[in-house]
């Protein structure tokens, strides 16, 4: 070790502790020094860590000049320690004596005499303490002992007899620490008293100081004071504080009441020594210091009567202060006290103590006098002026009087109106209609409402009507407290006022719980009526109990803390300044910091609750309380639950900023996310934008359109079809008489009539309509949408056009600059805590005038001038139907017009004041010939019903169906309308038609007027087609019978809907709709792991379904006497996962919402059966267009976000959580949470708030444990996609099956059987299905009859497990193929040209090993041409390789033969390939990384990187900052998200990055040049040590394992490093492994395999690496890389172009072999 290394290690040690020396003297010093320095001698004095070094001063001085550097490679740290010891001064003397030597008696006498003389001399100088001394007498060996004489001569000096090393060394260390501590504290006490540092004095006292030492220090302080009086210096002023504290402590024992004043003592914290050693104080003055926190231990000063704390920096007061029973005076002036209610502080000492006591005793005894006062009404009616008048603002009359032309640009303005009795929190809502959708989420029950209107407005009743109904609809069924306030009374006649009052009394007073003085007429200009209104508001606040008198005090503490953090008006120094708009950088910085406190995340909020003394079970109540009062805003939904808004005004400003933004392109209703900088730039931090978009979506201001980086803002759409929208509508939607009289049109539809509907409903519906597949939107506006319904042939054509467009866009993206994408990636990198990321990678969008939501047209525009430009030309090419009248063609065409009509006049008494109209037309065909229109009608009604049921509960809704007979007879007259319930009753009675009242003689077919009720897609079965057998089930819906189909005697289950006579109309409709919903969902599902629907029956309504013979999973698990085998359990898990994966891959995804063991049915318990488990019972299922909602039961199975979620929204990820519970149930046989016994309320709270989950058994396989824990994550976005789940379960199941084999034949048969092998490969195929799922809207299971096929088929990404399963055991299992092009015409693989040189039929998994040779040659792959393989990667059932000629080859993992070859679309040279989930990441020597989908064999993403030259990749699957790490020759390291492909982090090193490796513990080892860099992925900290390097050459490969890191170099050497701790490596070995560069290091169980360009591969035992097995046989050229295919199979890639791939079989254990010669491969859970 050279001197620089010694110095560096010494400095590192110095940073950890300070060395303190003990001078060891005497004949036995060598023994003492050797033994004591071998121990850990670290200890603490005060707050500093020391390490004792025992040394001989004379000897170190003598040897210091003779030290030489030692350059040996592996050297201990002793030399560095020794050099560091030279610089240490002795702080203690240790004299050693030989207890067997008589001379020791004389020697100790001489030393004692010398010590006494020294002590006497130093007593005169108290400032310099004497260095302590102690004796050690070594009494070891034979012979007489003189210990007793020596001890007698030692006198009072501490004495230790050394007999046994272990015991004596501990005693020596104990005496050493005591003496050194006493000595050091004496010095520091003297210093603290001398300089008057009370803070440090307190710290010393708290560390433990004897009373004698304190008295000595007190005496020294008196000496200083006395000296100052003699010399007239000011030292006495300096030591006043320290003297006072020491005096109080020293005199505390006399138990007399003392006073202590430490005023102006520069205290930075409360002296804790006071609470411990001054317990008899009666008065304590700590004023005018810098104390920031008062400790809870203040309660220990029981005698305290006066406590003066004014002029400090206190933010809070501990509740424990209430235990100071004698405290009479508490002075807290001039303290911030931001975290304690100011009103309580101002109420006096007695009330403050009582307040704190009530909180500790959990008493609800505080009064809350803050009341939310809501000002609502149209713009220009005087709301702001009324608020100012109530506030008592002294504005001029001209300012107070608001004219009708005044328009607010703020959505909500919040102010305070204070009064002695009550403090009103006034919310002034902007009256413009664009703000209306933003208001409803601010409206709460616990508030007073002022519905303000202008008395001079002739239509004031219509304005009042809307707001009264809006407030009522947001009151959760309660009656709100509404005051009707008319302004401008001064310009009205008494007659006008009387008429207005009569209108208000007759129509609106009934909606308010305020029965007296509800109506108020005021004049803000003169103040008339203002005082009376204010009195009435205060009276109502008291009467309605809005002034709360029984709330917990900790609510007030929490409110104080949050208000302090929030940016409330008047408290923010820069609240009015735009960010970046200040005059200085300092101002801008302050503004940014202020803005960040306008919201906090939920974890931070929980901490605030804890600091506010709230128990976990109290947090929800406190949150709801503050939310309802408008202090904070918090929405307990998956997207927003992590956000707590501290400043509602800020949130209102965010919404206003978007709605009132004046750019024309936003006014057209579409916001491009790339333009957000124009809206929010300089106002809101860019990292917050994705979360703001989600907030705006929650408040119905905008809707983020999936995957296209745009948002729809419905309130900014044109209200009516005007301009170009009107032109398109008039051209394509002919009048009803024209359509009917043409004789070529069939019409049907329905109306939804609402008594009231808040604004924003149609905007939410419009979003869902835009996402329905199989339609082509022609145009839409704020209250309507016109679309074409595509036939199946047109859907196929549409998908073809879409794929072409995507290819064009991908090509365009490759050619254009990606600046916008880079910018957005940077934005997201700053927002790692936000789960919602703006996806700006897609350039597709929606066209507002002519477009299809299923295709991806280019630009979006409403600008009339752009309709005829090139963009329109492109759009017209994408549209299936031309923009012409349907009457101009004879081809079939289906149309739908959906419009929302709101009430036009208050005087209208019609029930249909708000109407949603759906009209569907079929031209040149009938609904009997083409079901497209009927199926769409079912879909749209299902969508509407779901939206109404989930978000508009309590509204009065009637559904009416127009009579088509009336329409056909006279299209110009209003038709008769059938009631929806009458249609249901007719179907219930088996009647196929109704009779119109306008023409009772003509029957009207129900399937014509309400095709959604008849579900033409589902076959209808007659009673004589079914044979009933027995009842097998019963539920709330009705009965379930077992039966048979007459035609083929196949067994079925018949589920009947029984509607009782006692049930009301509403209940009957709800039950029927639930029945219809299940039929609708099941009619669109076709998968072997989902119960199949065969048909429908009527009178009563019945579903004929597939019969599943083995019952449900719940009852099977109850049979404890016959437990299910582990292999069968795995098969059940996989089957259920496949079924749910299929549901979630639908567009939109299906959310089951009731996944639990009773709804899982068992087809077979034979693990090799085609199907074992099926998902059933879709009565509660919904389609998820972003989210669904609704209150559910069975909370043990439900995701946290769905429990009690009547108004919350959630996604299909809720089913993922429930699936975790099913996995747990199958694994353990127990129900979820059976191990706990809580009440339901506590259960739900613990599941939602505390993350309670069932206990997974310890013997659960790690892979399954990981799947379960990921699936039941509390954060829905962290739950995995089912393609990952299927892959994990398939691999687990595949491993379990193969572990049972015991001989060659059985192994071969099992591995070749279709059921076993497909289980492992289907996951790869299914992984690929996710990418293209949105492009393939039809079911991806059209070939369900392949289960028993005798030929081997390729696994298509769009086909499921059971479809791909074959039962023939003689055929080879097909690999996970990227495309069906792998199959020849006969249905088998085209493999004639390719084979492994050793055997074309070899199964590599079963290759026999040579018992005497650890590395066994399998063969070389021969190909049809020469190829230079650049890189390779294992991809499940295939191995991918990339060649220099841009060829991409796919080889069978098990057979080793070439399956297929494709031409790569790019020509860049590949440097590395790795597998990441269902993707292959390909690094190149350019600046690009290509990401391939394993299923579709297409490039799904190209990443632009900062790398140059050779690029390496490493995949970190678990832990913090997981993802793909990349490094390049320029020295940059990047982390990429493995799902969104966005860059998350990056940093740079000095040298090229050549390799990376990760084992665990959040540690990534990076090879950079010749050095190893240790990088912590959790903290993003790295450590570089000059010792961690190769002495010659650079590092070319690196391998991290549990306790070791192996690094291979360009010189052929391998260095082995010991991992000492998380930031420290120690080189332990250097191996001369190869003669040239090491290209690969592969971990194989207990071995490490290396490859080199010297043509060799070497196998090292980790336990004994010095004796490797090396071979270069079969390698004609150097090994460039090694691909680990299985646990014991590796493929060596060489630079030889004729035999580039050499296959090797390597056992896990060299010595361990089975009886038949097959080495064990994997460990499995049984």
Swiss-Prot record:
Transmembrane segments: none annotated. LRR repeats lie at residues 256-277, 280-301, 303-324, 326-347. One of its GO terms (molecular function) is protein tyrosine kinase activity. Residues 800-890, 1319-1385 are annotated as: Disordered. Residues 1319-1331, 1349-1364 have a biased composition (Polar residues). This is Probable serine/threonine-protein kinase roco4. Belongs to the protein kinase superfamily. TKL Ser/Thr protein kinase family. ROCO subfamily. The lineage of its organism: Eukaryota, Amoebozoa, Evosea, Eumycetozoa, Dictyostelia.
């Amino acid at each position: 070790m050279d001197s620089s290394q010694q110095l560096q290690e010494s400095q590192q040690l110095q940073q950890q502790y300070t060395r303190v020396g003990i001078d060891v003297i005497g004949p036995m010093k060598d023994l003492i020094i050797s033994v004591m320095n071998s121990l850990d001698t670290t200890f603490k004095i005060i707050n500093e860590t020391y390490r004792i070094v025992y040394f001989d001063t004379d000897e170190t001085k003598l040897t210091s000049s003779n030290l030489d550097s030692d350059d040996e490679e592996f050297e201990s740290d002793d030399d560095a320690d020794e050099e560091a010891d030279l610089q240490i001064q002795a702080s203690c003397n240790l004299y050693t004596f030989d207890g067997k030597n008589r001379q020791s008696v004389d020697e100790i006498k001489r030393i004692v005499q010398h010590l006494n003389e020294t002590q006497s001399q130093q007593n005169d100088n108290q400032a310099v303490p004497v260095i302590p001394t102690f004796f050690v007498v070594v009494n070891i060996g034979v012979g007489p002992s003189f210990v007793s004489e020596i001890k007698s001569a030692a006198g009072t000096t501490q004495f230790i007899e050394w007999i046994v090393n272990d015991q004596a060394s501990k005693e020596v260390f104990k005496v050493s620490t005591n003496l050194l501590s006493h000595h050091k504290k004496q010095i520091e006490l003297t210093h603290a008293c001398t300089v008057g540092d009370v803070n440090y004095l307190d710290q010393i006292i708290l560390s433990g100081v004897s009373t004698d030492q304190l008295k000595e220090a007190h005496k020294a302080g008196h000496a200083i004071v006395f000296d100052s009086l003699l010399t007239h210096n000011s030292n006495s002023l300096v030591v006043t504080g320290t003297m006072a504290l020491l005096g109080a402590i020293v005199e505390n024992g006399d138990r007399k009441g003392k006073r202590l004043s430490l005023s102006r003592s520069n205290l930075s914290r409360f002296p804790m020594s006071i609470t411990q050693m001054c317990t008899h104080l009666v008065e304590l003055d700590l004023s005018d210091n810098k104390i920031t926190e008062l400790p809870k231990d203040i309660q220990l000063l029981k005698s305290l009567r006066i406590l003066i704390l004014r002029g400090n920096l206190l933010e809070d007061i501990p509740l424990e202060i209430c235990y100071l029973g004698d405290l009479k005076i508490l002075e807290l002036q001039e303290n911030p006290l931001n975290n304690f209610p100011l009103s309580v502080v101002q109420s006096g000492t007695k009330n403050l103590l009582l307040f704190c006591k009530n909180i500790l005793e959990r008493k609800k005894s505080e009064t809350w006098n803050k009341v939310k006062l809501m000002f609502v009404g149209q713009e220009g009616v005087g709301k702001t002026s009324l608020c100012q008048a109530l506030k008592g603002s002294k504005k001029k009359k001209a300012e107070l009087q608001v004219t009708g032309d005044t328009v607010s640009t703020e959505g909500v303005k919040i102010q305070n109106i204070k009064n002695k009795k009550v403090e009103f929190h006034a919310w002034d809502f902007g009256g413009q209609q664009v703000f209306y959708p933003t208001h409803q989420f601010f409206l709460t029950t616990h508030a007073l409402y002022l519905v303000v209107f202008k008395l001079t407005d002739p239509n004031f009743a219509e304005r009042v009507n809307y707001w009264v109904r809006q407030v009522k609809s947001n009151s959760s069924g309660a009656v709100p407290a509404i005051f009707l306030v008319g302004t401008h009374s001064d310009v009205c006649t008494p007659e006008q006022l009387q008429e207005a009052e009569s209108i208000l009394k007759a129509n609106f007073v009934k909606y308010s719980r305020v029965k007296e003085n509800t109506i108020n007429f005021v004049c803000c200009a003169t103040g008339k009526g203002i005082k009376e209104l204010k009195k009435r508001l205060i009276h109502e606040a008291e009467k309605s109990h809005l002034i709360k008198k029984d709330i917990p005090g900790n609510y007030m503490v929490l409110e104080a803390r949050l208000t302090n953090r929030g940016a409330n008006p008047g408290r923010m120094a820069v609240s009015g300044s735009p960010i970046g708009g200040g005059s200085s950088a300092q101002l801008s910085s302050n503004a940014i910091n202020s803005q960040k406190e306008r919201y906090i995340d939920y974890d931070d909020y929980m901490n605030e609750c804890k600091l506010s003394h709230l128990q976990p079970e109290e947090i929800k109540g406190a949150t709801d309380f503050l939310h309802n009062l408008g202090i904070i805003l918090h929405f307990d939904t998956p997207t927003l639950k992590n956000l707590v808004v501290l400043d509602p005004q800020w949130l209102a400003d965010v919404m206003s900023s978007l709605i009132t933004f004046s750019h024309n392109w936003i006014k057209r209703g579409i916001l491009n996310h790339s333009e957000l900088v124009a809206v929010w730039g300089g106002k809101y931090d860019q990292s917050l934008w994705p979360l703001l978009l989600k907030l705006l979506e929650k408040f119905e201001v905008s809707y983020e359109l999936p995957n296209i980086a745009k948002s729809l803002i419905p309130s900014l759409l044109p209200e009516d079809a005007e301009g170009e929208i009107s032109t398109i509508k008039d051209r394509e939607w002919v009048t009803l008489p024209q359509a009917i009289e043409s004789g070529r049109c069939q019409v049907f539809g329905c109306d939804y009539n609402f008594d009231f509907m808040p604004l924003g409903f149609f905007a939410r519906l419009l979003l869902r309509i835009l996402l329905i597949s199989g339609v082509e939107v022609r145009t839409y506006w704020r209250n309507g949408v016109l679309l074409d319904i595509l036939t199946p042939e047109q859907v196929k054509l549409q998908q073809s056009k879409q794929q072409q467009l995507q290819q064009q866009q991908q090509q365009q993206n490759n050619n254009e600059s990606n600046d916008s994408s880079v910018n957005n990636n940077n934005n997201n990198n700053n927002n790692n805590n936000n789960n919602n990321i703006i996806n700006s990678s897609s350039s597709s969008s929606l066209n507002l005038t002519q477009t299809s939501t299923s295709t991806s047209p280019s630009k979006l525009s409403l600008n009339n001038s752009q309709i005829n430009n090139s963009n329109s030309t492109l759009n017209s090419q994408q549209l299936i139907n031309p923009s012409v009248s349907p009457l101009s063609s004879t081809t079939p065409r289906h149309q739908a017009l959906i419009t929302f009509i709101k009430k036009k006049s208050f005087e209208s008494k019609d029930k249909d004041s708000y109407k949603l109209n759906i009209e569907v037309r079929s031209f040149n065909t009938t609904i009997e010939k083409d079901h497209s229109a009927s199926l769409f009608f079912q879909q749209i009604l299902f969508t509407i019903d779901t939206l109404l049921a989930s978000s508009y509960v309590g509204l009065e809704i009637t559904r009416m169906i127009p009579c088509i007979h009336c329409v056909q007879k006279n299209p110009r007259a209003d038709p008769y309308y059938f009631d929806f319930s009458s249609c249901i009753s007719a179907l219930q009675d088996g009647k196929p038609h109704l009779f119109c009242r306008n023409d009772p003689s003509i029957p009207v077919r129900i399937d014509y007027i309400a095709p959604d009720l008849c579900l033409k897609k589902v076959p209808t079965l007659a009673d004589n087609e079914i044979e009933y057998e027995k009842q097998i089930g019963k539920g709330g819906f009705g009965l379930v019978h077992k039966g048979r189909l007459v035609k083929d005697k196949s067994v079925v289950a018949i589920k009947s809907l029984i509607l009782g006579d006692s049930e009301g109309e509403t209940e009957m409709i709800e039950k029927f709709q639930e029945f219809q919903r299940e039929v609708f969902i099941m009619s669109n599902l076709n998968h072997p792991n989902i119960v199949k629907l065969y048909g429908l029956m009527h009178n009563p309504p019945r579903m004929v379904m597939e019969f599943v013979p083995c019952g449900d999973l719940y009852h099977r698990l109850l049979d404890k006497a016959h437990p299910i085998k582990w292999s069968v359990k795995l098969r059940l898990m996989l089957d259920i996962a496949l079924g749910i994966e299929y549901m979630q891959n639908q567009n939109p995804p299906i959310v089951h919402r009731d996944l639990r063991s009773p709804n899982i049915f068992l087809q077979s318990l034979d693990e090799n059966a085609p199907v074992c488990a099926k998902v059933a019972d879709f009565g509660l299922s919904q389609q998820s267009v972003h989210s669904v909602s609704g209150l559910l039961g069975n909370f043990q199975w439900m995701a946290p976000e769905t429990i009690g979620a009547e108004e919350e929204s959630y996604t299909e990820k809720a089913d993922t959580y429930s699936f975790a519970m099913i996995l747990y149930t199958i694994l353990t046989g127990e129900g979820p949470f059976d191990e706990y016994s809580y009440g339901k309320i506590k259960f739900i709270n613990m599941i939602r708030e505390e993350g309670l989950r069932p206990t997974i058994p310890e013997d659960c396989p790690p892979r399954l444990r990981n799947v379960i824990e990921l699936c039941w994550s509390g954060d829905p976005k962290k739950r995995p996609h089912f393609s990952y789940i299927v892959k994990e379960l398939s691999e687990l199941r595949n491993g379990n099956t193969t572990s049972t084999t015991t001989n060659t034949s059985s192994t071969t048969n099992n591995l070749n059987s279709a059921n076993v092998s497909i289980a492992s490969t289907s996951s790869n195929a299914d992984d690929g299905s996710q990418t293209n799922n949105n492009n393939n809207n039809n079911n991806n299971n059209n070939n369900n009859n392949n289960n028993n096929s005798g030929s081997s088929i390729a696994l298509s990404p769009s086909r499921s497990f059971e479809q791909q399963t074959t039962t023939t055991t003689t055929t080879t299992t097909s690999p996970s193929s990227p495309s069906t092009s792998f199959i020849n015409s006969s249905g088998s693989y085209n493999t004639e040209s390719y084979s492994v040189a050793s055997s074309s039929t070899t199964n590599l998994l079963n290759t026999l090993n040579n018992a005497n040779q650890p590395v066994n040659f399998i063969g070389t792959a021969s190909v049809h041409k020469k190829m230079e393989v650049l890189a390779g990667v294992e991809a499940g059932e295939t191995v991918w390789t990339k060649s220099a000629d841009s060829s991409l080859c796919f080889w069978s993992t098990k057979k080793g033969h070439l399956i297929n070859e494709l031409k790569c679309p790019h020509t860049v040279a590949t440097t590395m390939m790795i597998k990441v989930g269902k993707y292959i990441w390909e690094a190149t020597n350019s600046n690009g990384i290509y990401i391939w989908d394993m299923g579709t064999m297409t490039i799904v993403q190209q990443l632009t990187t900062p790398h140059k030259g050779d690029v390496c990749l490493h995949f970190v699957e678990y832990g913090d900052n997981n993802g793909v790490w990349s490094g390049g020759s320029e020295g940059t390291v990047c982390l990429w998200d493995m799902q969104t492909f966005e860059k998350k982090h990056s940093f740079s090193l000095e040298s090229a990055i050549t390799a990376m490796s990760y084992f665990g513990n959040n540690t990534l080892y990076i090879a950079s040049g010749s050095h190893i860099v240790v990088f912590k992925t959790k903290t993003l900290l790295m450590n570089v040590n000059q010792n961690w390097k190769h002495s010659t050459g650079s590092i070319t490969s690196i391998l991290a394992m549990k306790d070791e890191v192996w690094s291979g170099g360009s010189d052929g050497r391998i260095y082995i490093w010991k991992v000492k701790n998380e930031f420290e490596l120690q080189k332990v070995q250097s191996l001369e492994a190869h003669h040239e560069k090491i290209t690969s290091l592969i971990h194989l169980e207990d071995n490490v395999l290396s490859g080199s360009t010297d043509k060799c591969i070497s196998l090292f035992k980790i336990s004994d690496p010095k004796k490797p097995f090396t071979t270069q046989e079969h390698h004609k050229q150097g090994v460039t890389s090694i691909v680990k295919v299985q646990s014991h199979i590796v493929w060596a890639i060489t630079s030889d172009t004729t035999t580039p791939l050499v296959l090797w079989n390597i056992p896990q254990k060299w010595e361990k072999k089975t009886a038949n010669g097959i080495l064990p491969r994997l460990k499995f859970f049984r």
